[in-house]
């Protein structure tokens, strides 16, 4: 999975897909009551990027629904995963539940259309800190109450704050979640980062019977050398400001027979087992 990073304006969606991304990450900004208002990162953000691009959250969902609905004139078959970078760290933890209800409801109304020809992409809920775990509970509760639990099959969870992996597992256990789990490791592209925690996450992913990580990705990679380093370690995905650079690296002899771009037929919740 090549994840385009910080794709917050509607016109950027096709821009990043044209560069080779098959997944996009966008920031979801909340008001003080936990209502999702905009796709917006704000200042500061990654080096060399404009931090202020935004869209109204529901309008953004309407657009990506079209892009991921077969038969729609805007359909792009390559876009298979939407990662919502939920800016919950900007609101009080006690509002995390309200935020989960709101995001689930807006996805039902604007993306899935409650079963009426909605978008088909998989959804990854990126949660900054384990203390905001009530968001997940609220999201699942809302799908259940609204009678649309079928969408759980499309939804995964990912804690992105580089917290202790065992602490993350404990929170997932508390929530009763042991599938559809991704693990991100990374830092803003402005700073270097070692591979110690990334290696630990990959080790857990590859431990037979370990359920709490099915995919691991590194973010936000801009240098080809760091992309190569991550691929050598065996990541499932790379988040980048420059998807075209990832595409180029994947074509190199060292990687071209080991990796390929994920398509809609690839299940993002299953561990990859090499043949």
From Swiss-Prot:
Single GO BP term: killing of cells of another organism
UniProt xrefs under SUPFAM superfamilies: PLC-like phosphodiesterases
Cofactor: Mg(2+)
Disulfide bridges in this chain: 45-51, 47-190
GO cellular component: extracellular region
EC number: 4.6.1.-
CDD domains linked: GDPD_like_SMaseD_PLD (cd08576)
Tissues in which the protein is found: Expressed by the venom gland.
Binding note for cofactor: Binds 1 Mg(2+) ion per subunit.
Task performed by this protein: Dermonecrotic toxins cleave the phosphodiester linkage between the phosphate and headgroup of certain phospholipids (sphingolipid and lysolipid substrates), forming an alcohol (often choline) and a cyclic phosphate. This toxin acts on sphingomyelin (SM). It may also act on ceramide phosphoethanolamine (CPE), lysophosphatidylcholine (LPC) and lysophosphatidylethanolamine (LPE), but not on lysophosphatidylserine (LPS), and lysophosphatidylglycerol (LPG). It acts by transphosphatidylation, releasing exclusively cyclic phosphate products as second products.
Protein family (similarity comment): Belongs to the arthropod phospholipase D family. Class II subfamily.
Entry protein name: Dermonecrotic toxin SpeSicTox-betaIIA2v
Source organism per UniProt: Sicarius peruensis (Six-eyed sand spider)
Lineage: Eukaryota, Metazoa, Ecdysozoa, Arthropoda, Chelicerata
